[in-house]
C-alpha cells in the first residue's frame, strides 16, 4: 500500500527486504527495547546511515523513543485496531469452557484475558499469523481426519477422507501437516494482522470489546520513518492520513509518558470525534487482578500535550505502582533467562 501510494505520485520506489537476525542485533538494543524494538531500531539506523531512504514498520512494534534526526514521515490510513478471539468454531469468549486454554505471547492480551476470565489458562504462542492459526486448528482437524479414515477402514457410511481434504482451505491443509505441541481452545490476534494475511474471511472470529480489551498503542497502523530533510515531505504528501496520525500520536504519547512500554500490560485507544480525541487507557497487573483505567476527551488542537497530561494523571492514580511491579517481574525474568532462553511473554505480538 505504501509503495502504490508513492507510485501514484510518480515516485520510483524500490522495496528492499532486510533480514536482521537476533545474532545481528546489538545486545544493548535488545536489553533496552526488546527484540522487536531492537529490530525496528536496526532498520531505522540503516535509514540514518543513508542505506535506505525510508523504513516501513508496524507502529505498535515501534519504541516510543526515536533517534535524533529521524521522524515518522507518514502514517497511512489505519486498519481496524482491535483484537479478535479465534476458535475452530467461532466460540465467543464468555462461551469458552471453564479453564479453557488460550494462546498469546502478549503481556497485554494475557492480562486482559485473565481480568475477564481468571479461570483461563494462558499459554505462549509464537510465529507469524499462519503458524499461529495452524497451531490452533491442527488438533481438531487431525482428529476429524483420523475419524474419517477409521470409518472408511471399518466400512462405515462416512465422507471419503480424500474428498473431505479437498474441501479444506489451504490454512486447514497446512494445519493437518503440523505437529501438535499444545492443544488450544482459542488464540487472540490483531484483526489488522489477520486481514493483511488474507485469512480473516476464512477463519471463525469474534471481536473482543475495546472497552475491556483496549488495543496496544498504534495497533493496526503503519508508520514510515525517514531522516529529516530527505524524502519526508514526499512521503507525507503521498500517504499521510491526518486522522490516523492524530489518533496514533495520542496513543504513543500516553504510552511514552506512562512508561513501561515493553514490560507492562498497557492498552491505549484514541478515536478522533470532531474537535476532541476520545481516549481510553488501561494499565494492568500481569495477572489481570489490578486494572487502572480511565477515559478522557482530549482537545484535538493540542492533542499531544493533552495526552501527556492524561498520562500523568494515570500515573498518579496508581499506574506508576502497577508499572513498577511489572518492572520487577521483568527484571526477575531477565535474571532467570541469562542462560540464553527466550522469555515466555513479550510486550506485544501479532
Regions found by a protein language model. Give the residues of each.
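Small-molecule-sensing regulatory modules
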Residues: 1-19, 32, 135-350
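Generic structural signal for residues in well-ordered beta-strands
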Residues: 13-15, 72, 122
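Short, charge-patterned binding micro-sites
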Residues: 21-26, 131, 142
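A conserved helix-loop-strand patch within extracytoplasmic ligand-binding domains
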Residues: 59-60, 69-118
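Short glycine-rich anion-binding loops that position phosphate/pyrophosphate groups of nucleotides
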Residues: 59-62, 192-194
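Short hydrophobic/aromatic-enriched beta-strand-loop microsegments
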Residues: 74-76, 120-129
Amino acid at each position: 500500500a505504501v509503495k502504490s501510494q508513492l507510485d501514484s505520485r510518480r515516485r520510483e520506489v524500490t522495496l528492499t527486504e532486510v533480514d536482521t537476525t537476533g545474532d545481528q542485533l546489538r545486545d544493548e538494543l535488545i536489553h533496552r527495547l526488546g527484540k522487536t524494538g531492537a529490530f525496528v531500531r536496526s532498520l531505522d539506523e540503516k535509514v540514518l546511515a543513508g542505506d535506505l531512504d525510508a523504513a516501513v514498520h508496524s507502529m505498535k512494534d515501534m519504541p516510543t523513543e526515536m533517534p535524533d534526526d529521524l521522524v515518522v514521515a507518514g502514517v497511512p490510513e489505519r486498519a481496524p485496531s482491535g483484537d479478535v478471539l479465534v476458535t475452530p468454531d467461532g466460540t465467543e469468549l464468555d462461551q469458552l469452557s471453564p479453564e479453557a486454554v488460550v494462546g498469546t505471547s502478549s503481556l497485554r492480551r494475557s492480562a486482559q484475558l485473565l481480568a475477564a476470565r481468571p479461570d483461563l489458562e494462558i499459554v505462549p504462542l509464537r510465529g507469524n499469523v499462519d503458524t499461529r492459526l495452524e497451531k490452533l486448528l491442527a488438533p481438531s482437524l487431525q482428529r476429524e481426519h483420523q475419524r474419517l479414515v477409521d470409518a472408511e477402514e471399518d466400512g462405515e457410511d462416512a465422507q471419503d477422507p480424500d474428498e473431505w481434504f479437498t474441501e479444506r482451505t489451504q490454512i486447514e491443509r497446512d494445519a493437518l501437516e503440523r505437529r501438535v505441541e499444545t492443544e488450544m481452545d482459542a488464540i487472540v490476534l490483531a484483526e489488522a494482522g489477520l486481514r493483511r494475511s488474507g485469512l480473516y474471511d476464512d477463519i471463525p472470529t469474534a471481536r473482543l470489546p475495546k472497552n475491556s480489551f483496549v488495543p496496544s498503542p498504534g495497533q493496526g497502523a503503519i508508520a514510515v520513518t525517514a531522516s529529516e530533510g530527505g524524502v519526508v515531505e514526499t512521503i507525507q504528501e503521498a500517504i499521510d492520513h491526518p486522522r490516523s496520525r492524530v489518533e496514533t500520536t495520542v496513543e504513543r504519547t500516553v504510552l511514552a509518558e506512562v512508561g513501561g512500554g515493553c514490560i507492562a500490560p498497557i492498552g491505549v485507544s484514541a478515536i478522533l470525534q470532531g474537535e476532541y480525541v476520545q481516549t481510553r487507557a488501561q494499565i494492568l497487573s500481569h495477572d489481570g487482578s489490578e486494572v487502572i483505567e480511565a477515559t478522557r476527551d482530549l482537545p484535538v488542537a493540542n492533542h499531544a500535550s493533552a495526552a501527556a497530561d492524561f498520562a500523568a494523571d494515570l500515573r498518579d492514580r496508581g499506574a506508576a505502582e502497577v508499572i513498577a511491579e511489572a518492572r520487577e517481574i521483568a527484571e526477575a525474568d531477565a535474571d532467570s533467562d541469562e542462560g540464553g532462553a527466550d522469555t515466555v511473554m513479550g510486550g506485544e505480538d501479532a
